[in-house]
Swiss-Prot record:
GO terms of biological process kind: endoplasmic reticulum to Golgi vesicle-mediated transport
Keyword Transport included in the entry's annotation: yes
Coiled-coil parts of chain: none
Cellular localisation: Golgi apparatus, cis-Golgi network; Endoplasmic reticulum
Disulfide bonds: none
Its job: May play a role in vesicular transport from endoplasmic reticulum to Golgi.
Claim: tRNA-binding is one of the keywords in the record: no
Keywords: Endoplasmic reticulum, ER-Golgi transport, Golgi apparatus, Transport
Protein name from the UniProt record: Trafficking protein particle complex subunit 5
Leader peptide range in chain numbering: none
Amino acid sequence: MESRFTRGKSPLLERPLGRPRGEVSLSAFALLFCELVQYCQRRVYSVAELQSKLAQLGHQVGLRLLDPLVSRERGGRRETKVLSVLLFVKGPVWRALFGKEADKLEQANDDDKTYYVIEREPLVNTFISVPRENSTLNCAAFTAGLVEAVLGASGFPAKVTAHWHKGTTLMIKFEEGVIARDKSLEGR
């Protein structure tokens, strides 16, 4: 009788607390995110306002995501260098959100404070059908707001924007003080 309730999996109370399963059904995520976009779309008048609203909501998620991830992944230790925090975003943050790492992390050739996180097929754009009049809409603005919050709460203030290039590219532009601090840490 007991096996009928557990269905071959370990019982809920016997699972370890340190690493809870964070799996969410893809169809449930798609439905919730589509409804979130529709909700925001009804309350704004332009694509720029819609992307700003999605970024604000992503910012709220990012603030709540950082602390549990740092405590699980790093044992409570925060990053102090720009490259290590970007690798944290590309790896553990992306895996917690989308189940895989981001496709690429690149630095701009001409600017030492600009980095790019490239995702060829972002999950947030997969289930959204965009009308012709809103063809510039990129729902990855939600992810950009989330990454901006994670970086800001980690002590690396930056402006993060989503662009269509090689799929979707998040452009991360750090403040001057962050780069100056990183260079002074390298000198030690």
